[in-house]
Swiss-Prot record:
Subunit structure comment from the entry: Part of the 50S ribosomal subunit.
Gene3D superfamilies: Ribosomal protein L22/L17 (3.90.470.10)
Organism of provenance: Thermotoga petrophila (strain ATCC BAA-488 / DSM 13995 / JCM 10881 / RKU-1)
Protein name: Large ribosomal subunit protein uL22
Role noted for this protein: This protein binds specifically to 23S rRNA; its binding is stimulated by other ribosomal proteins, e.g. L4, L17, and L20. It is important during the early stages of 50S assembly. It makes multiple contacts with different domains of the 23S rRNA in the assembled 50S subunit and ribosome.
Family the entry assigns: Belongs to the universal ribosomal protein uL22 family.
This protein's UniProt keywords: Ribonucleoprotein, Ribosomal protein, RNA-binding, rRNA-binding
GO MF, one example: structural constituent of ribosome
Top-level lineage group: Bacteria
GO cellular component terms attached to this protein's record: cytosolic large ribosomal subunit
InterPro entries: Ribosomal_uL22, Ribosomal_uL22_bac/chlpt-type, Ribosomal_uL22_bac/org-type, Ribosomal_uL22_CS, Ribosomal_uL22_sf
HAMAP family (UniProt xref): Ribosomal_uL22_B
A Pfam family the protein falls into: Ribosomal_L22
GO terms, biological process: translation
Length: 159
């Protein structure tokens, strides 16, 4: 069921404020960690990100521990941070966590000059990455889905 957003700007702003307040009352089931401006090529980091996406946290740690790639060491730190955020900030248990999202975005590029023959020069681009990992609690997903459905019914009935 798609919620109907009011057309007038005043009603729309009130609608979104109410919706935001009500959404904040939902149970927290995910935690996030971001590493920004990491000096590794996004293409190389994405290969590792694709291997751990959808896996349980324990399985993801094992995959990262046995990978010889530089990106695996970085992802391991970010994953540890996401798990710590889930435990400390939201009280989620580690056994039920899984990697729901894991993606790598391009960061800025440092440009360096590489001298070539006959007075020419090539530009070397040293790439950076922004790595984001979101962990989610499997045991609380049904509870969250039910609460969200009730909330949407409540919002649609108020209009």
């Amino acid at each position: 069921m798609k919620l109907q957003v009011p057309r007038s700007s005043l009603k729309r702003s009130i609608f979104h404020k109410k919706r935001k307040e009500l959404l904040s009352s939902l149970p927290k089931i995910e935690a996030k960690a971001v590493a920004r401006y990491i000096r590794i090529s996004p293409r190389k980091a994405r290969a590792i990100a694709n291997t751990i996406r959808g896996k349980s946290v324990e399985e993801a740690f094992q995959i990262l521990a046995f990978s010889p790639k530089k990106a695996a060491r970085i992802m391991e730190k970010v994953l540890k941070s996401a798990v710590a955020n889930a435990e400390n900030n939201f009280g989620l248990s580690v056994e039920n966590l899984y990697v729901s999202e894991c993606y790598v975005n391009d960061g800025p590029r440092m440009k360096r000059i590489w001298p070539r023959g006959r007075g020419r020069a090539d530009i070397i681009q040293k790439r950076m990455s922004h790595i984001t990992i979101v962990v989610r609690d499997r045991s609380k997903e049904d509870e969250y889905r039910k609460a969200l459905e009730e909330l949407e019914k409540k919002i649609s009935s108020e209009e």
